[in-house]
Regions:
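Helix-terminus/linker motif at the lipid-water interface of multi-pass membrane proteins
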Residues: 30, 34-52, 121-135, 191-202, ...
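Short alpha-helical transmembrane segments in multi-pass integral membrane proteins
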Residues: 1-22, 79-151, 199-258, 314-379, ...
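Small-residue hotspots at the loop-to-helix junctions and early N-terminal turns
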Residues: 48-59, 141, 145, 208, ...
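Transmembrane alpha-helix boundary and packing residues in multipass membrane permease domains
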Residues: 25, 29, 41, 58, ...
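Transmembrane helical elements of multi-pass membrane transporters/channels
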Residues: 20-39, 147, 181, 214-218, ...
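Small-residue-rich hydrophobic transmembrane alpha-helices
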Residues: 51-114, 155-174, 286-352, 383-405
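Generic alpha-helical transmembrane segments of integral inner-membrane proteins
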Residues: 26, 30, 34, 38, ...
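Short runs within selected transmembrane alpha-helices of multi-pass transporters and secretion channels
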Residues: 72, 76, 147-166, 174-185, ...
């Protein structure tokens, strides 16, 4: 028992450092997801077709968001280690890489959405009821996408800045910027969706406009703070005096980061493909999944952000050459993450059924959403472990391994299971959803042996 405690349980100082880093990130994402939840409810009050149209577009934006995240994460592997080593110039080059990569991804995404947005939305619409509801949902989806695209550029810029700021251990400022953005989004949503006083009722278009405006607010706050506090953001020294970076630096980040960039993109595409497989069961399934996903995201933030903190803490230890400290911290953080998420899973099981009742939709959709939430709660502790394993492997630059562990697993195991069960069996959609989610157990076993092998204990800078 003493050995177990020594290996997997830290002291007060350890948890204080971990939580000081994690809590602002958890709060930031909690507020963001809470506002997304409120936004979802407000759009849901307009009708099932409006809610479904917006939900489908948000699936497409999800792929874009993860592609940007992958682009900046490629350089973040080096950024955390550069900062840990005190190499501010290297940190600056990693920032440039992030900015260029995020803007390139944005340009590609906007081109695809402009030229084939209708086709992408249509992939998720199957008219099983024969009442024309899918055509209405398509029209609302197109309206939402055309406006929300305007907010992609500020999102890309924010990610480049915010990730570099977090690598220096300053998680408070991105949190404040996020508060301002989501707060304004909530207020603007209410005013523009329903129309208050002289402001006209804009419905779905109002939700899109509110999202775009909040993106710009967040970007302005993050960028202005970073440039006004150069002493805390040394990577900005000379960041805009030139546009290039040493070929050696670029090559190293690109080669190490390419699997990670592809991983985020392919994983997100895989998840949306799974949703598309579910969508053949009808519009009610898409609506139920939308509600369940919105609620689940509120609870998932704990393991997502605790996992992200692993990459920062372990990355800094690795950059400083303290490999044993990195291994020790990793063991303790993984156990802590799984414990916290087990508690969250119990809470989610107990209260999850209340949330779908808030929506203005059919009893069938509410029932489906409640079942999907229960399944997600059961699987959550396993997701916490695999997520922690992913960030452990990533912190040591094992991007090819993370590529195989994450996106290849999704496309080789998860997508085929969802495709076959949804299209070629008579199983109910809840049973299909449970079996697809249960594939996470296979990933737990793989993650355990990968982390235990210590293949990630590498100093790269």
């Amino acid at each position: 028992m003493h050995k177990f405690r020594q290996k997997y349980i830290g002291d007060k100082a350890f948890y204080k450092r971990y939580l000081m880093l994690a809590i602002p990130m958890i709060i930031q994402n909690a507020i963001t997801n809470l506002v997304s939840f409120l936004d979802n409810i407000m759009v849901g009050q307009l009708g099932t077709e409006q809610m479904s149209g917006v939900a489908i577009v948000n699936q497409l934006i999800f792929v874009y968001n993860l592609a940007v995240f992958g682009a900046v994460s490629a350089a973040s592997i080096f950024g955390a280690q550069y900062f840990g080593k005190g190499n501010h110039k290297g940190h600056m080059y990693s920032f440039r890489f992030k900015l260029y990569a995020a803007l390139l991804v944005t340009a590609i995404a906007m081109t695809l959405f402009i030229t084939n947005g209708t086709g992408f939305i249509s992939l998720y619409l199957t008219d099983t009821a024969g009442n024309g509801a899918t055509e209405v949902a398509l029209a609302y989806g197109k309206e939402y996408l055309e406006i929300v695209m305007i907010g992609l550029i500020p999102f890309a810029v924010t990610q480049a800045y915010a990730t570099n700021i977090k690598e220096t251990g300053q998680t408070f400022v991105p949190m404040v910027a996020s508060f301002a953005a989501v707060g304004s989004n909530a207020v603007l949503d209410f005013l523009l969706i329903f129309g208050i006083g002289p402001i006209p009722k804009l419905g779905v278009a109002g939700a899109a406009i509110a999202t775009v405006m909040s993106r710009y607010i967040e970007t302005i706050i993050v960028v202005l703070w970073a440039h006004k506090n150069r002493d805390k953001n040394r990577y900005l020294e000379g960041a805009y005096r030139g546009i290039g970076m040493p070929f050696g630096e670029f090559k190293t980040i690109f080669i190490k980061g390419l699997p990670l960039m592809l991983n985020e993109l392919l994983w997100a595409a895989g998840m949306t493909t799974v949703t598309q497989c579910y969508s053949v069961r009808g519009l009610s399934v898409i609506a139920g999944l939308n509600i369940a996903t919105t609620i689940t995201n509120l609870f998932n933030i704990v393991f997502i952000q605790l996992g992200a903190c692993i990459s920062i803490v372990v990355g800094q230890y690795l950059g400083a050459g303290e490999l044993e400290k990195a291994k020790d911290a990793d063991n303790k953080m993984i156990v802590f993450s799984v414990f916290c998420c087990s508690v969250m899973a119990v809470v989610m099981l107990l209260v999850g059924g209340f949330f779908p009742q808030i929506y203005n939709t059919t009893d069938e959709i509410k029932s489906l959403a409640t079942s999907f939430i229960a399944v997600s709660a059961i699987i959550m502790p396993f997701c916490a472990f695999t997520h922690s394993s992913y960030f452990t492997l990533r912190s040591g630059g094992k991007t090819l391994v993370t590529f195989l562990f994450d996106s290849v697993f999704t496309w080789v195991i998860v997508v085929p299971v969802a495709f076959v069960l949804a299209k070629y069996t008579a199983l109910g959609i809840v049973a299909v959803y449970f079996l697809v989610q249960a594939t996470e157990l296979i990933k737990v076993v793989i993650g355990y042996f990968m982390v235990k092998s210590d293949v990630w204990l590498v100093q790269m800078v």
